[in-house]
Amino acid sequence: GKPKIRFKGYEDDWEQRKLGNVLLSLQNNTLSRANLSDESGIAKNVHYGDVLIKFGEILDVRKEKLPMITDENVLSKYKASFLQNGDVIVADTAEDSTVGKCSEIAGLNDEVVLSGLHTIPYRPIEKFASGYLGYYLNSGAYHNQLIPLMQGIKVTSISKSAMQNTDIDYPKSQEEQGKIGAYFKSLDEMITLHQRKCEETKSLKKYML
């Protein structure tokens, strides 16, 4: 089908494919916070709690402080699952329906970054423009498909096998994908700027009272 709102100049139908035909799952580690260091280490680790609360749709590994892995054995065990730009990390466990929230990896140069406890790391089988998957997989259009698949009462989770049959919609043109990603990124930057201004104004008010 075609989306109702669209950038000018694009007319082609979008693709709709099953997640299992678009994304390949990698291996995650099971290190808890206690097994990680905030000070130093040999690799960075993406923890599900940070995906749920701290990180946005795009995780720029240069800008965010990530907990570190200190054990060499972990690196050799997960060598085939070192993350790359464009990989998507899904939090598969939460205390509510935010299960399935994800972050797309960006800004990665030579660092070793791994996907941690209660996450499903995915790698696109074909190349996507930066940002598209991060924003699409967090959208209501996608996330609403996950709600009936969630299991558990106090702690909610979603399985890799359940996600395989969910639908991913995307434009065939990487140029159109890129415009969508860039548009939402600019909105995020605007929100951050206004939040900062809001905090500064609140501080000023407090100071003047």
Task: List the predicted regions and their residue ranges.
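Activation segment
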Residues: 18, 55-56, 194, 202
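DNA target-recognition domains and sequence-specific DNA-contacting regions of bacterial/archaeal
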Residues: 23-170
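A detector of tandem-repeat and repeat-rich interaction/domain scaffolds
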Residues: 181, 192-194, 199
